[in-house]
UniProtKB/Swiss-Prot annotation:
GO terms for biological process: DNA replication. The lineage of its organism: Archaea, Methanobacteriati, Methanobacteriota, Stenosarchaea group, Halobacteria. ATP binds at T73, G74, K75, S76, L77, Y220, R232. NCBIfam families: orc1/cdc6 family replication initiation protein. The gene is orc2. It comes from the Archaea. Disruption phenotype: Essential for normal growth. It holds the Pfam family AAA_22. This is ORC1-type DNA replication protein 2. Belongs to the CDC6/cdc18 family. The keyword Nucleotide-binding applies. Disulfide bonds: none annotated.
Amino acid sequence: MTPDSSPSSVDDPLFESGHRIFANKDLLKIGHVPEADRIVGRDEEISKLAKRLNGAVHGYSPENVMIYGKTGTGKSLVSKHVCQRAQNAAQDGVEIGTAYIDCAEDNTETQAISSLAAKLNNESSTGISVPHTGLSTSKYYKLLWKTLDAQFDSVIIILDEIDLMNDDSVLMKLSRAEEAGKIDCSVGVIAISNKIQYVDNVNERVKSSFQHKELFFKPYDANQLREIMFNREDFSSSTTTYSISWPGWTASSCSRARFKAATF
């Protein structure tokens, strides 16, 4: 069929048109790490976490941190944000590696370590190949150690939803790697959990080795939730407007947020 003979397009409500509500949907993605001025109500937590990880910026050992808080309180967001800034702030040629593991997906020791090795490895630089499957846990650890020493002075690892991991010994092995002579680079672990009692159920040997500092994230209040919404207002542009209600808002406190339609 030639272009001249092709049928004209017909608007069908079943499919999206070229006009969409959101100009930049990346701002709404769960894994998106926004700029510092978009993170609301977490200045104190950012500062406290940065203090614990400060050693990595100078090539020393970062501290291990256990972060607690309910779902949706910014634990993962702040952790990723601070790690990103630590990488950018690294001084005097210090190389910092960071990796994020979702323990809801990689919930076995082997899965977590193989994912870490794959994420932290730059094969073109190290010459190391990390297969997704097929190796024993101990071999994946060896690949991870080789990968880290080949590239980094310090590494910060985020283990999100650590309470879903079926073997907490991964905390001990990662946090003791340098002390045990497995690697020369320093490793710090940020473990995140919704369950404040998680550490109470951790093996005593693991707990003793991990030697973590604790950080608790309180739920956002109504004002912070409202500010979060408006801090992402520019995910839209200035055409058609839509209004949504936000629970707990009143007319006197800007009870309606406007989202404007835009074309990509």
